């Protein structure tokens, strides 16, 4: 379900792209140090975004360096290391573990079960470090699964379940900023859930699997359906952006530029080609 929260490359210059690479490679390196290759295979843009957000907000001591790795052995790449990349690595493993379990339950994918089993030994320590977040992840996934198994097309309830999950992950600690971070995560989580449904609609229809947007697709003409989906996605990102603007993050810092770029442009990077492809097929 993750992979939609990325940057819009054309809207950034080299210093910002290098800083993004530092956080992304830093997260990969942190996953490798803490969880080995199985951890690195769970790397996602979405959790790199959360690490950048927390770093911009809380301004921790961050070590920037450069180095080579197995996938990139020739040219040294920038790297970052701080406490929020450690946190993002833990949340990456927790979310990936439950996602693999969900895939196993839905599709009986042995590959997903195998991946979940590789990550399972790390879960007790992650739960001990982050009890509030991991409890919210399990509770909201249970709520979401119950809605989906019941065939619910209550988009508000479905988005709320995944939004509350991501909101808990956004709130690193309980402080003055946690309500704003939770609300921001709630909006972004709703967007991710709907974007995943929009992306997977043809595949889910072929397999006869639940899709939150199927009812809308079946009842609206194609053009109206596309416009309605765009409105729903815009609404969720509007909630996210509204809360983001309340945070004391300087727009002109490298991290600030990355966050503004992602929220206002990057998250739409996958939507646009999907819609263009579908509208082309309808002609």
Placement of each model-derived feature along the sequence:
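Acidic catalytic motifs of isoprenoid enzymes
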Residues: 1-183, 190, 194-234, 238, ...
């Amino acid at each position: 379900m993750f992979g939609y929260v990325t940057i819009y490359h054309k809207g950034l210059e080299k210093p910002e792209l290098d800083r993004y690479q530092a956080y992304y490679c830093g997260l990969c390196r942190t996953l490798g140090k803490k969880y080995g290759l199985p951890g690195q295979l769970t790397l996602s843009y979405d959790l790199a975004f959360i690490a950048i957000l927390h770093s911009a907000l809380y301004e921790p001591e961050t070590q920037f360096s450069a180095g080579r790795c197995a996938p990139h052995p020739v040219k040294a790449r920038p790297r970052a290391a701080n406490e929020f990349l450690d946190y993002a690595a833990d949340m990456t493993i927790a979310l990936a573990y439950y996602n693999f379990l969900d895939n196993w339950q839905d599709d009986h994918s042995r590959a997903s079960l195998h991946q979940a089993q590789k990550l399972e030994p790390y879960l007790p320590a992650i739960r001990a470090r982050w009890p509030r977040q991991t409890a919210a992840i399990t509770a909201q996934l249970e709520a979401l699964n119950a809605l989906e198994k019941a065939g619910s097309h209550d988009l508000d309830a479905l988005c709320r379940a995944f939004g509350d999950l991501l909101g808990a992950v956004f709130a690193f600690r309980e402080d003055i900023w946690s309500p704003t971070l939770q609300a921001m995560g709630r909006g972004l989580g709703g967007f991710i859930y709907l974007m995943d449904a929009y992306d997977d609609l043809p595949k889910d229809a072929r397999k006869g699997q639940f899709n939150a947007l199927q009812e809308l697709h079946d009842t609206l003409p194609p053009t109206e359906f596309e416009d309605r989906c765009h409105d729903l996605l815009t609404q969720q990102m509007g909630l996210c952006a509204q809360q983001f603007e309340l945070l004391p993050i300087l727009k002109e810092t490298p991290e600030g530029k990355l966050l503004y770029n992602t929220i206002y442009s990057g998250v739409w990077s996958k939507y646009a080609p999907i819609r263009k492809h579908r509208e082309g097929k309808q002609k």
